[in-house]
Structures are given as structure tokens and as C-alpha cells.
Amino acid sequence: MGPVMLDVASYELDAEEREILKHPLVGGLILFSRNFHDAEQLRELVRQIRAASHERLVVAVDQEGGRVQRFRDGFTRLPAAQYFAAINDAATAAQLAQEAGWLMAAEMMAMDIDISFAPVLDIGHVSAAIGERSFHSDPQQARIMAECFIRGMHSAGMKTTGKHFPGHGAVTADSHKETPHDNRPLAEIRTHDMVIFRELIQRKLLDAIMPAHVIYTEADARPASGSAYWLQEILRQELGFEGIIFSDDLSMEGAAIMGSYAERGQASLDAGCDMILVCNNRQGAVSVLDNLSPIKADQLTRLYHSGQFDRQTLMASSRWQQANKALTALSERWDAHKQTLGQ
């Protein structure tokens, strides 16, 4: 298995994509909204992906909830992470967050999708890229909700990915469009943003971590996604993280400072990433495959899902029906609240 995760263009594979998926450096594929028409089509696309590759790929998606939910029609409308903080009763909020993690994971695994890149562990809501994707502005409250969501995912059989290390929540710039700079003192980042990562790593609840395309100017001139300081010295050595490290999408503008696509990919792997994402640019992806040194990343097999869910049986279960009803209601209440605020 190779260290590169790619994407595909539409509802089914074309001939070029079938050949690319056989490349020895390819180890994963991420799905987007453009790959989804309905549940039956999606399941068939995943079957095609499995059949095209020589080895079982890690199939992934961003199915967080709120505005970042790639599959909608026929799937539960998942609330964004911030919504759980609006529930007045802490026990109810914790239970519903856990059910959200379970339900999201179960619905994805019924499609034979291995992982959803979740949960978001960024603190606060000021970032344009993060906003309501964050559980809370208080690190401990965010950790409590994230841990519940994680336990739900694990109970279903899906591995977790905490993002975006060491924290994207305090920068207003969107790393999809530019390279954000976080100029805060390193001590503040350590005692505020990194707390949630540290505590969840200590509890061995994070199977993978995705670093931010953010430059933390007090620490390094490179984005964290391409920084050996953040990935090796801090994440591996200081925090003792033993799981998988993903890059975020190297086609994002926040990664452009690292050079060409091939240079971005090599820099991220050299810095300590186990798998790099190259999406939304076929030419860039091919350049990475053509120029990367041969490398195996067999540790990525740890990310395969271990749950078995039949979609019809899942949706007929009382647990799914109750969770679906509660989560949909929470999303609708939050939408009504935002409308009163003119958002």
C-alpha cells in the first residue's frame, strides 16, 4: 500500500482513474459531494474502487455534519459540532454526541467506507475555515464532547482522525484560500489549542491526526503539515502519538508555500506524514505519483473499518431511528436559531 490518497471526478470511475488506482504509491481515495447521486450509486462506486486497485485502499470522506457533510439525500442530517453545546443538559448533550459519532460511522460503513475524517478538535469559532465545525471555545468542554463523539465512532467500528493539529481555531484566514499565519506565543498554543490533542492522545482515543496548513510563526516557517518540528518533535516525541498522520489536501492554497505538488508531497512525507492527500487537481496528483520516491505505508491498513452494517437493517433498527430523529431535530433547532440572528 502506498502513501498517496487521491480523488475521482464523478459518479463512476473512468478508464484513466482505474489505471491510476493501480499505481503502487496509491493507498487511499477520498470521496466528495460530486461523487454522490444516491446511496445505491455510491455503494456501486465504492465497489468499483475496490475492484480497480491491486490492494484494498482506505476509502475516506468528510462526513462531519453541518456544512461539511458530503452525502445528504438518504443519510441523516448531522448537526455541526457546535450544536451540541446548545443543549442545556450536559448528560443529554454527551449522549447525543456519542450517538452522532455512532450513527455517522454506521451509515458510512454501510457504504463500505472506512473512515470519515472526524472529529474536528480546533478550539473556537472565529476561523473562517472552522466556525461551527468546532465543538466549543473552551478546551475542556470541547474535549468532553469530542470524546463522546469518538467513543460513538469506535463503538461502530470506525477509526478516528483528530484535526487540525496543533489547532486551526484561532486564525481567521481560510487555509483553502491562503496560507494562514498564527502569530500567538507558542506557550498559548500549547496551553490552549493543544490541550485537547494531548488529553485524547493520552487516552489512546485518536487513531489518526491531520495537521493544519497553518504557519505558527513562533515555532517554524513551514505549515504544520510540512513541519518536522510539529509532526516529529511535538506530536511523535513529546505527545507520544503512535497513530497515522495525514496531510490535509495538498491542493489547498495553505500548502502552496511548500512548492510544486511533487515538492509538497515529498516535504509532507519527509516531515512525518504517513499519508498525503492530493485532491481536486488531476495533473498535480499525477505529478506526485511520477516524482515521489517508492515507499510503502502498510501501517495504513490499521484504518480499515471493522464494523459490518447492512443499510436496510441499520435503518430499520430502533437505535438508528431514535438517533436520526434526535439529530435531525437538533439541526433544525439550530437552523431556526441562526435565522433569528440573521445568519
From Swiss-Prot:
PROSITE patterns: GLYCOSYL_HYDROL_F3. Belongs to the glycosyl hydrolase 3 family. NagZ subfamily. Plays a role in peptidoglycan recycling by cleaving the terminal beta-1,4-linked N-acetylglucosamine (GlcNAc) from peptide-linked peptidoglycan fragments, giving rise to free GlcNAc, anhydro-N-acetylmuramic acid and anhydro-N-acetylmuramic acid-linked peptides. It is an enzyme of class 3 (hydrolase). One of its GO terms (cellular component) is cytosol. Its main location: cytoplasm. Substrate binds at D62, R70, R133, K163, H164. Keywords: Cell cycle, Cell division, Cell shape, Cell wall biogenesis/degradation, Cytoplasm, Glycosidase, Hydrolase, Peptidoglycan synthesis. The active site is at H176 (proton donor/acceptor), D248 (nucleophile). It catalyses: Hydrolysis of terminal non-reducing N-acetyl-D-hexosamine residues in N-acetyl-beta-D-hexosaminides. Pfam families: Glyco_hydro_3. Its EC number is 3.2.1.52. One of its GO terms (biological process) is cell wall organization. The record marks D174 as: Important for catalytic activity. GO terms for molecular function: beta-N-acetylglucosaminidase activity. Pathway: Cell wall biogenesis; peptidoglycan recycling. This is Beta-hexosaminidase. The keyword Electron transport does not apply. It is found in: Cytoplasm.
